[in-house]
Amino acid sequence: MSQLHRGMHKKPGMFPPKEVLEEVDAGSGSDTETEETVECTEEEEEQDETDGLGDLGMPPPKKTTKSAASPTVPAPALIPSLSHLIGLEGKQPSRKYAPAEWPQYFKQKISVARDNDTFNVLYTPPDDSEAPVYVFHHGAGSCAESFALLSVRLREMMHEERFQLAATAKIRDENKLPGMIAFDARGHGFTEVESTDYSLEAFTNDFAFIVANVVAEFGLTNNLILVGHSLGGAVVTNACHLKLIQHPVIGLAVLDVVEGTAIESLASMQQILNSRPKSFPTVEKGIEWTVQSHTIRNRESACVSVPPTLISQHDGPGMTWRTDLMLTKPYWKGWFTGLSEKFISCAPAKLLILAGTDRLDKDLMVGQMQGKYQLIVFQESGHFVQEDAPDKTALSLIDFWKRNDKVNKTVPLFGAFRA
């Protein structure tokens, strides 16, 4: 039997009154977080496909019609110069890249023990037994905090909606805010696992273990919605396909990963990983590089999701990547093989959110035409859709829950996104 240890930190009030959120139209562009999201030029957008450096499951870099050897048009750099970002004079970084911490986004931090392994879990309990619990799995090279901003947006928007309904006497209460479960996968963040097995099977068994133990520890009876980004999408899909979650699952949401393009991108992944800076003088410089390289476009999200992916160097000053993704290379193809077929065959309602329409493979195109899952496309988002566009992602997940939860009796206020 595993042991769960509750964190010492709790955050009591996360949802002060906010302005009424404007309805987001299906064809709208990026979120309205203009101060948090770094804008990019058309030239930079052409390189977006090579910017998802912290995760796998990306399409191959787009080809340019201009010669790299042209004396007048130099080849575009895959990564911004590290010396440019750090500054040759050693000037201090702007405080706008100051690291943020998990208590601003989750209410509890707990440890789930299994033999000699310890999993780091971030948890926010649901406010009502009828509210859903979203269970998140991050992608390769990322961490639980990749869903931090999304978690807050989900509860804020749900609170705002129920406040409006209560004000018009359409409901009797406003306490059905969703719960959140996010954790660091093996080899990532602050989770400590002895094994170096990074197969899909190992990740999937870990996921099922975490869900079972958190549900049991807190006595949750709520319906679950599984949400996975990139590699995490393959993990939650596999767990659902194998029926490893012994608790009601009403929804499966996969964020920006498609089997066909994921496997195609593997040929360029080593080049992309080798092109990343190997170290940073400070955590703030790591955040700055992540934002300026458009790996994550939302500065607020990067400030909380990047720090756990860095660790102090053993052989000198500065920070380096916590997860050595090259150690996972033997498992890359196995992560995504069969993903589309498994996703389409899963019993719960299914949602696929993509950053671009060109990423559907044949199986998914056929399944989408047959109405086997809901497809939403964020045209102006990068690979980390939950971080780049947390408002749109939250609205989509709320609408997805309301469409598929038999317990829910309210009509969504938010307009649905359409493919």
Swiss-Prot record:
GO terms for cellular component: mitochondrial small ribosomal subunit. It catalyses: [phosphatase 2A protein]-C-terminal L-leucine methyl ester + H2O = [phosphatase 2A protein]-C-terminal L-leucine + methanol + H(+). GO terms for molecular function: protein C-terminal methylesterase activity. Pfam families: Abhydrolase_6. It is an enzyme of class 3 (hydrolase). Residues 1-75 are annotated as: Disordered. Keywords: Hydrolase, Serine esterase. Residues 1-12 have a biased composition (Basic residues). Residues 32-52 have a biased composition (Acidic residues). InterPro entries: AB_hydrolase_1, AB_hydrolase_fold, PPase_methylesterase_euk. Its EC number is 3.1.1.89. It comes from the Eukaryota. The active site is at residues 230, 256, 383. The keyword Hydrolase applies. Demethylates proteins that have been reversibly carboxymethylated. Demethylates the phosphatase PP2A catalytic subunit. Belongs to the AB hydrolase superfamily. This is Protein phosphatase methylesterase 1. The lineage of its organism: Eukaryota, Fungi, Dikarya, Ascomycota, Saccharomycotina. The gene is PPE1.
